[in-house]
Swiss-Prot record:
Species of provenance: Pseudomonas putida (strain ATCC 47054 / DSM 6125 / CFBP 8728 / NCIMB 11950 / KT2440)
InterPro entries on file: Ribo_uL30_ferredoxin-like_sf (IPR036919), Ribosomal_uL30_bac-type (IPR005996), Ribosomal_uL30_ferredoxin-like (IPR016082)
GO CC annotations, alphabetized: cytosolic large ribosomal subunit
GN (gene name): rpmD
Name under which the protein is recorded: Large ribosomal subunit protein uL30
Gene3D superfamilies: Ribosomal protein L30, ferredoxin-like fold domain
Record keywords, A-Z: Ribonucleoprotein, Ribosomal protein
């Protein structure tokens, strides 16, 4: 399965609760933290919801 690198580039402070949960669900903890997640429809949905706080590669 393909993977995608996701980096948190903006703070989750003051954001919508559902968007905070999406960032947490992706495994991101702090600004600048990068994780590699599988490219599944579930992960893509979380990325699409919180796209304005994330940088996606791959």
């Amino acid at each position: 399965m393909a993977t995608v690198k996701v980096t948190l580039i903006k703070s989750v402070s003051g954001r919508l609760p559902n968007h905070k949960l999406c960032v947490k669900g992706l495994g991101l903890r702090r600004i600048g933290h990068t994780v590699e997640v599988q490219d599944t429809p579930e992960n893509r949905g979380m990325i699409n919801k919180a796209y304005y706080m994330l940088k996606v590669e791959g």
